[in-house]
């Protein structure tokens, strides 16, 4: 939503599914004025310290002519208990359309960690200037709420008619604010509409927000609606108010075409004017609830992650008997293939009930005839290529290596097509029961790029994701093309991928990092890809599986 008078409000962020989500609500008090006659137009910019640099992740809307703003735009973040997550809050005056703090617009900042905010729920800190001194008596207050309990979103559309006119030479410029009542009976701003200029019968733009933001997932929680006439000085004229609950809003719009309306009451007029009826009418024209399923909804509903491994055995890896080989089996240090297998597979196996994983090799001559194969079972059992847990994959890899001849070329399409076959059978069920993840470990340039692109485009329409870990120091530019981060991947005939299903990561970027860093990077996109696929097919999660409590046998008599 964008409005030149009320300020710029950015679109809600795209969240990574599967993480805990925290919403931060921000207010400030006693901000420094521009001068004796002019109040600031404040905005708060949130930065997160990540990868050794401060990165902007969110910002509030701009409020005009306000020294003690209460921002309606929530700042949403993913919260990870195992990470420190340092945060900076920069308050600046968005004078003349400024979009970032400058020396002449900077109003102050503060720094803390997300963990500190979450553990205290509410934090009030003084704002500091760039010289480290306090910015007068300016403070910033941050309130944290964890989003939990529901994933419902609400789409609301309001309009009004016959509102009181507050402008002597024109018509009112109405906007509406929505507040929810907190447990301590304080009111929390949850939404502010745009301003509709010069109109006593405004129709505000539809808007969407989470049920948690609207009423803390409590449909009986009181909601307060306040209508104002906008004034550029920041002293908006009060028109009227009314109260409701989300349950009442739902019931009043339950039938198709049904609308709900409230009298907009100014208590001062009601108490003083004998024949006062209302200051206008507000109409709820639309109230729809949208269920947004998460990765955990699907996992808890019975969806299994079917994990398959494909290992590059081409000659470019080097002779395994040499210490310089990428396949060298040193007793002192596991090679990069083994490190990647353990890091990624160790997490994926928790989402597969039988913990049996097909494992294939490509680019090698295999016994007994030593013909080149691009999708052979590394346990040499083509009828049952599955290995017991990741430890079984590693054991099969170690046994396989001395029995094969590394050769070439690096053809990846055959293994993608092989994994796509069961994924296509799964698709035909129309249920969210099994999602395939293929881990490809390779050291070099793909030889069958055209065929691989075609295979990926086909797989993008199936319940399937592909993770490629580049081992060694080769040129991986082709792999980055497959990743699709620079635009949709297309097959040679020009057909685009239905969705981005490939995640490529070079192992060299993580060789000195903890194994968890690699796993976190390569698996980061999988929850989103799972949800995107099933949502695109209109497939809801299964019912949550019932929990079975372990019991202790009674002692024998």
UniProtKB/Swiss-Prot annotation:
GO molecular-function term, one example from the UniProt record: metal ion binding
Binding site for Ca(2+) 1: 167, 173, 229, 231
SUPFAM superfamilies referenced in this protein's UniProt entry, alphabetically: C2 domain (Calcium/lipid-binding domain, CaLB), vWA-like
Cofactors: Ca(2+)
Primary location recorded for the protein, binned into one broad class: cytoplasm
Gene Ontology CC: axon; clathrin-coated vesicle; dendrite; endosome; membrane; perikaryon; plasma membrane
CDD domains xrefs: C2A_Copine (cd04048), C2B_Copine (cd04047), vWA_copine_like (cd01459)
Localization per Swiss-Prot or TrEMBL: Cytoplasm; Cell membrane; Endosome; Cytoplasmic vesicle, Clathrin-coated vesicle
C2 domain segment(s): 2-127, 134-263
Record's keyword annotation contains Membrane: yes
Region of interest: Linker region: 244-303
Binding residues annotated for Ca(2+) 2, in chain numbering: 167, 229, 231, 237
Family matches, as InterPro entries: C2_dom, C2_domain_sf, C2B_Copine, Copine, Copine_C, VWF_A, vWFA_dom_sf
Domain VWFA residues, every copy: 306-526
UniProt keyword terms in alphabetical order: Calcium, Cell membrane, Cell projection, Cytoplasm, Cytoplasmic vesicle, Differentiation, Endosome, Membrane, Metal-binding, Repeat
Keyword flag Transmembrane helix: no
GO biological process per UniProt: cell differentiation; cellular response to calcium ion
Function: Calcium-dependent phospholipid-binding protein that plays a role in calcium-mediated intracellular processes. Binds phospholipid membranes in a calcium-dependent manner. Plays a role in dendrite formation by melanocytes.
Subunit composition and interactions: Interacts (via second C2 domain) with OS9 (via C-terminus); this interaction occurs in a calcium-dependent manner in vitro. May interact with NECAB1.
Entry's family note: Belongs to the copine family.
Entry remark concerning the domains of this protein: The C2 domain 1 binds phospholipids in a calcium-independent manner and is not necessary for calcium-mediated translocation and association to the plasma membrane. The C2 domain 2 binds phospholipids in a calcium-dependent manner and is necessary for calcium-mediated translocation and association to the plasma membrane. The linker region contributes to the calcium-dependent translocation and association to the plasma membrane. The VWFA domain is necessary for association with intracellular clathrin-coated vesicles in a calcium-dependent manner.
Protein name as annotated: Copine-6
Organism of derivation: Pongo abelii (Sumatran orangutan)
Gene (UniProt): CPNE6
């Amino acid at each position: 939503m964008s409005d030149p008078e009320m300020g710029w409000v950015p679109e809600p962020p795209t969240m990574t599914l599967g993480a805990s989500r925290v919403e931060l609500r921000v207010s400030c008090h006693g901000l420094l004025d521009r001068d004796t006659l002019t109040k600031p137009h404040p905005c708060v910019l949130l930065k997160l310290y990540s990868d050794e640099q401060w990165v902007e992740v969110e910002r509030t809307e701009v409020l005009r002519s306000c020294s003690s703003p209460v921002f309606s735009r929530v700042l949403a973040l993913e919260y990870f208990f195992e990470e420190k997550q340092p945060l900076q809050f920069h308050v600046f005056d968005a004078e003349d359309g400024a979009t970032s703090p400058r020396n002449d617009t900077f109003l102050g900042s503060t720094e803390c960690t997300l963990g500190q905010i979450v553990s205290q729920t509410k934090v009030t800190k003084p704002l500091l200037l760039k010289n480290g001194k306090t910015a007068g008596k300016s403070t910033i207050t941050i309130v944290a709420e964890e989003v939990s309990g529901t994933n419902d979103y609400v789409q609301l559309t309001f309009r009004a008619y016959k509102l009181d006119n507050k402008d002597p030479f024109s018509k009112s410029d109405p906007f509406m604010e929505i507040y929810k009542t907190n447990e301590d009976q304080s009111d929390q701003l949850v939404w502010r509409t745009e301003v509709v200029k010069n109109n006593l019968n405004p129709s505000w733009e539809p808007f969407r927000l989470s049920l948690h933001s609207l009423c803390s997932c409590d449909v009986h929680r009181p909601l307060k609606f306040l209508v104002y006439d906008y004034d550029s000085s920041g002293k908006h004229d009060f028109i009227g108010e009314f109260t409701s609950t989300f349950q009442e809003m739902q019931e009043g719009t339950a039938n198709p075409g049904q609308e709900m309306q409230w009298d907009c009451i100014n208590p001062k007029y009601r108490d003083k004017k004998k024949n006062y009826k209302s200051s206008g009418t507000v109409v709820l024209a639309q109230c729809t609830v949208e269920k947004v399923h998460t990765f955990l909804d699907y996992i808890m509903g019975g969806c299994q992650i079917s994990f398959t491994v494909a290992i590059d055995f081409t000659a470019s890896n080097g002779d395994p008997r040499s210490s310089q080989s990428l396949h060298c089996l040193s007793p002192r240090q596991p090679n990069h293939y083994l490190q990647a297998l353990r890091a990624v597979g160790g997490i994926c196996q928790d989402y597969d009930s039988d913990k049996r994983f097909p494992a294939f090799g490509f680019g090698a001559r295999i016994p007994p005839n030593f013909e080149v194969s691009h999708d052979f079972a590394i346990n040499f059992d083509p009828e049952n290529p599955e290995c017991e847990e990741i430890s079984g994959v590693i054991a099969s890899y170690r046994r396989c290596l001395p029995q094969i001849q590394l050769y070439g070329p690096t053809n990846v399409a055959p293994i993608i097509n092989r994994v796509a076959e069961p994924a296509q059978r799964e698709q035909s069920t129309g249920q969210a029961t099994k999602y395939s993840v293929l881990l490809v470990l390779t050291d070099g340039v793909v030889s069958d790029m055209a065929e691989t692109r075609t295979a990926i485009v086909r797989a993008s329409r199936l319940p399937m994701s592909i993770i490629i870990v580049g081992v060694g120091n080769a040129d991986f530019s082709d792999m980055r093309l497959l990743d699709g981060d620079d635009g949709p991947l297309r097959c040679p005939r020009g057909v685009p991928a239905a969705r981005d299903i490939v995640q490529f990561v070079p192992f060299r970027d993580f060789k000195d990092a903890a194994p968890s860093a690699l796993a976190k990077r390569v698996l980061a996109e999988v929850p989103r890809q799972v949800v995107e696929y099933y949502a695109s097919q209109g497939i809801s999660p299964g019912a949550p599986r019932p929990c079975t409590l372990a019991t202790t046998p009674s002692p024998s008599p």
